Regions:
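Short, hydrophobic transmembrane alpha-helix segments
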Residues: 27-39
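Hydrophobic alpha-helical transmembrane segments of integral membrane proteins
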Residues: 187, 191-192
Length: 288
């Protein structure tokens, strides 16, 4: 197995484990508040599915609207279209809709519920900053998100996380038949810790999908160093030119639009750039 396939496979296994953990947490919290009542648990399941349905079908429109992205034609951005057309052919994907975000910070994201209904948005800053090869690396990363259906994975994770938070609140306010001090402490602990645990797991899933997209992007463009170099320049650009971003859209971007350090790293949607670059440069022998 090549280094690229090993990296992608490893990220997939870790994502599966994290998704199972998140689902298990939902089942445990649902059982606590329902007292094992099947009807109540089905109600909570329906709530989570409704959130997921909305996220799946409308998240692309919301993301593009929140970012201020504007459709761009081939005559307006010929190099962008040329690069995406070449990379989609190599990846076996249909051509996504292309957008430009009128922001100076260099950044990009992909969205859409499946490859046939996908879009790639790049900022004005990234078009001005990166070389052609670096831009191809970034675009290949975003196309990998589309190929891997990461938007669906994140939608499911977000839906489960939202359901856990909602159920935790319900557990606190509705309480249970057991009014002993120990039961009350348990309810309070669940209310405080369950949403935090769900968020940490969601962020870990997001980080694993970024690693997988880096590996897949390196394979599609055929040059891991192009993506590694781009990531370093994008991180510098994000620091130098902050971008106002709705926090809900932050996980979509290839690099975090703003930095988080220390314990905040647990809640980061993106792995450290230095680790991403290190992994990409380890792939060079297998793709060279």
């Amino acid at each position: 197995m090549t280094t690229t396939k090993q990296s992608t496979f490893g990220a997939t296994i870790r994502t599966t484990i994290l998704m199972a953990s998140l689902s298990g947490l939902l089942v445990v919290i649902g059982a606590l508040i329902s007292g094992g009542n099947p009807s109540t648990m089905l109600l909570f399941l329906g709530f989570a599915l409704a959130i997921n349905f909305f996220s799946y079908f409308f998240s692309d429109k919301m993301a593009l609207a929140m970012s201020g992205a504007k459709p761009v034609t081939e005559s307006e951005a010929p190099k962008l279209y040329e690069a995406v057309r070449e990379l989609t052919a190599r990846a076996g994907l249909p051509m996504p809709r292309l957008y430009v975000i009128p922001q100076d910070q260099p950044n990009a994201f992909a969205t859409g519920r499946n490859p046939k209904h996908s879009a790639v948005a790049v900022t004005r800053g990234i078009l001005n900053l990166l070389s052609d090869d670096e831009l191809r690396g970034v675009l290949a990363h975003e196309l990998t998100h589309i190929r891997n259906r990461d938007i669906l994975i994140q939608s499911v994770a977000s839906a489960i996380g939202a359901a856990i938070t909602y159920i935790a609140y319900m557990l606190l306010w509705l309480g249970s038949d057991d009014n002993s001090p120990l039961a009350l402490v348990g309810q309070l602990a669940t209310f405080l810790l369950a949403p935090i645990a769900a968020t940490i797991i969601q962020m870990a899933i997001s980080r694993q999908r970024e690693y997988a997209a880096d590996a897949g992007g390196a394979e599609i463009c055929g040059n891991p160093e192009s993506l590694a170099s781009a990531l370093l320049r994008l991180e510098q650009g994000a620091t130098a030119k902050p971008m106002q971003v709705n926090q809900a859209a932050e996980p979509l971007y290839i690099v975090k639009p703003f930095s988080s350090k220390g314990i905040a790293g647990l809640f980061s949607t993106h792995p450290p750039i230095e680790e991403r670059v290190k992994r990409l440069r380890q792939m060079r022998p297998s793709l060279g």
